[in-house]
């Protein structure tokens, strides 16, 4: 495989290319292509019900009642290309007309269909961020029901505000071209806000706001370009529409939904990977030995904070440890399973024991190699035990003794006083 350093590219482009390949490898490891296909079929079932619920929420407020058609146009324009929007509008009208005759069971199934899409997104995003402790189902249901109700209201405010500004300024009449550009910028801004909220709130872990904003903005811009390019492709491919007529819409719609979800998922991978950009952490090879070193570094920083009666967040740890936020989260979860650290309700972490009571050998056995768990009659394990015995003898020290022998090179952690959890 050709190394990037051998390519005739400037260092900045080499770094960007290498980081992009790192994000793509993560996307492939998380099976984003297959997940995008799954979300595509889920969207086919829930797209019309989801838009219907959104329109019902908007229509419930008289101030937005006159904007319902603009609201529907905005949703269809940003979710699907024009050719599919015309078809979906027909089904949407039929569905909305029949929604008033639904029973309580029917309404519950309608809401469940919409929530199932959100729960699928929740599971996917938590997998991308390597979250091992997902939220409880009831909490998820409450969060996404809030999104279904408050999301349309925020969009309604944005659409009504932009419409009022265009009418008040007279641009819609005097400069329709400029008004169209402003509308497109408004759509891009709203899409950025929605994706930023999605990337920032859905994963059950710490996501820096700037990372969510950068990922949301780049994904929204990519979706806009992809939608324009796909629309151009559909215009060129008139042969399919001539042969298949209205049936040609559905294959194109499937392809677009697959492309849309793949873009959103890769945007999520980018957002989750941005913490690896600082210090070129993405160049490191992740292995058990590296994780052991990061876990030991984590305990060192927590022990420094313990001296001052403080707890640390993931952002504080990332400032001293060269790895990603998701990797820090996994290490903290592993240390919590060992009973060494505890997380507070505020999301801060603290060491539960004095450094004198924390064994490095136990840490080595958990993260790297534990031959004691092998069968007694395993000859290979027995031989390896003899080989690594001197190494384990050197590791059979406490965290306090390690700190005494090898004081940390970085500065001690200094933060505002925060009480340690329980």
Swiss-Prot record:
Listed Pfam families: Virul_fac_BrkB
One cellular-component annotation, GO: plasma membrane
Coarse class of the protein's main subcellular location: membrane
Residues that span the membrane, as ranges: 44-64, 102-122, 141-161, 178-198, 212-232, 246-266
Disulfide bonds: none
Compartment annotation: Cell inner membrane
InterPro entries: UPF0761_bac, Virul_fac_BrkB
Topology relative to the membrane: Multi-pass membrane protein
Keywords associated with the record: Cell inner membrane, Cell membrane, Membrane, Transmembrane, Transmembrane helix
Sequence similarity: Belongs to the UPF0761 family.
Listed name of the protein: UPF0761 membrane protein LHK_02978
Organism: Laribacter hongkongensis (strain HLHK9)
């Amino acid at each position: 495989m050709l190394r990037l350093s051998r390519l005739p590219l400037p260092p900045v482009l080499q770094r960007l290319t290498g980081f992009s390949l790192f994000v793509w490898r993560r996307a492939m490891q998380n099976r984003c292509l297959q997940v995008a296909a799954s979300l595509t079929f889920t969207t086919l079932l829930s797209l019309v019900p989801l838009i219907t619920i959104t329109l019902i929420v908007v229509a419930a407020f008289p101030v937005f009642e006159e904007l319902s058609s603009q609201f529907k146009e905005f949703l269809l324009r940003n979710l699907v290309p024009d050719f599919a929007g015309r078809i979906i509008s027909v089904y949407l009208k039929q569905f909305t007309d029949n929604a008033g005759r639904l029973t309580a069971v029917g309404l519950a199934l309608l809401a469940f269909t919409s929530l199932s899409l959100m729960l699928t997104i929740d599971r996917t995003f938590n997998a991308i961020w390597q979250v091992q402790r997902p939220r409880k189902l009831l909490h998820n249901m409450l969060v996404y029901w809030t999104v279904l109700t408050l999301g349309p209201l925020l969009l309604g405010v944005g659409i009504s505000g932009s419409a009022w500004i265009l009418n008040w300024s007279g641009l819609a009449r005097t400069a329709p071209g400029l008004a169209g550009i402003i509308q497109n910028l408004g759509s891009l801004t709203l899409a950025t806000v929605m994706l930023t909220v999605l990337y920032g709130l859905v994963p059950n872990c710490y996501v820096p706001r700037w990372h969510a904003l950068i990922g949301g903005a780049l994904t929204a811009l990519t979706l806009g370009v992809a939608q324009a390019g796909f629309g151009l492709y559909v215009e060129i491919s008139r042969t399919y529409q001539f042969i298949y007529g209205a049936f040609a819409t559905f294959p194109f719609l499937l392809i677009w939904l697959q492309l849309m979800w793949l873009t959103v998922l890769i945007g999520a991978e980018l957002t989750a990977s941005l913490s690896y950009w600082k210090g070129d952490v993405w160049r490191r090879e992740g292995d058990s030995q590296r994780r052991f070193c990061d876990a030991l570094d984590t305990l060192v920083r927590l022990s420094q904070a313990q001296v001052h009666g403080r707890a640390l967040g993931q952002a504080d740890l990332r400032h001293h440890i060269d790895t990603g936020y998701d990797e820090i989260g996994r290490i903290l979860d592993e240390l919590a399973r060992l009973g060494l650290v505890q997380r507070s309700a505020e999301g801060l972490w603290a060491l539960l024991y004095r450094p004198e009571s924390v064994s490095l050998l136990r840490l080595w056995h958990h993260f790297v190699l534990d031959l004691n768990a092998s069968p007694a009659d395993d000859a290979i394990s027995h031989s390896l035990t003899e080989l690594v015995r001197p190494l384990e003898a050197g590791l059979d020290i406490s965290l306090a003794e390690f700190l005494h022998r090898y004081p940390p090179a970085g500065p001690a952690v200094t933060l505002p006083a925060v009480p340690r959890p329980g």
